[in-house]
C-alpha cells in the first residue's frame, strides 16, 4: 500500500482588540483569512504564524485551536486557529493584494467564497470547538 500524501495547511482568524478580523485579498480567491501550506519539518501552529506574517506583515500569537477542514478529494487538511496581533505592519505580497482589519459583519460580506466564509464562522463559534468539516 502506498503511503498517503496529504497537504497540511494552517489558517488563522486574527482578531484585534476592537474585535476586527484580519483579511487579505488573494488574487485567486478574493478576501480571506491568512493561511497556507505548512512546510516540511514545521509545527502546524508555527506554519499558521509564518503564513500570517508572510501574507500580511502582522506578527501574531495563537490563542486557540479551532478545528479542521478536510478536502477529501484533494487530500488537503486545513487546521484553523484563533489568534491575536502582537506586532508588525501591513505589507502586501504576490499572495495578498490588499490587507486590513474589518468588522466581522463587513468581513463576512467581503469574503465571497462560501467555504472560506464558513471557516470564519466556525472559528468565531467557540462553543463548538473543536470542529471537523469534511467535504
Which residues fall in each region the model found?
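Conserved Nudix-box catalytic region and its N-terminal flanking loop in Nudix hydrolases
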Residues: 16-54
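Exposed loop/turn and edge beta-strand positions of beta-sandwich/beta-sheet ligand-binding modules
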Residues: 8, 34, 95
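Short, charged/polar surface micro-motifs in flexible loops or helix N-caps
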Residues: 15-20, 28-30, 72-74, 85-89
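Conserved S-adenosyl-L-methionine
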Residues: 63-67
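Conserved hydrophobic "DFG−1" position in protein kinase catalytic cores
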Residues: 14-15, 23, 83, 101
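Conserved N-terminal beta-strand and adjoining loop/helix that marks the start
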Residues: 1-21
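Unchanged
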Residues: 38-61, 71-123, 135
Amino acid at each position: 500500500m502506498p503511503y498517503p500524501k496529504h497537504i497540511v495547511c494552517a489558517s488563522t482568524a486574527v482578531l484585534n482588540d476592537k474585535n476586527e478580523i484580519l483579511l487579505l485579498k488573494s488574487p485567486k480567491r478574493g478576501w480571506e483569512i491568512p493561511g497556507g501550506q505548512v512546510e516540511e519539518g514545521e509545527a502546524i501552529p508555527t506554519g499558521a504564524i509564518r503564513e500570517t506574517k508572510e501574507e500580511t506583515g502582522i506578527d501574531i500569537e495563537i490563542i486557540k485551536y479551532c478545528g479542521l477542514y478536510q478536502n477529501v478529494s484533494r487530500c488537503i487538511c486545513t487546521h484553523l486557529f484563533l489568534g491575536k496581533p502582537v506586532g508588525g505592519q501591513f505589507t502586501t505580497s504576490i499572495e495578498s493584494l490588499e490587507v486590513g482589519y474589518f468588522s466581522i459583519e463587513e468581513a463576512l460580506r467581503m469574503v465571497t467564497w462560501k467555504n472560506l466564509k464558513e471557516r470564519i464562522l466556525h472559528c468565531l463559534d467557540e462553543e463548538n470547538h473543536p470542529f471537523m468539516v469534511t467535504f
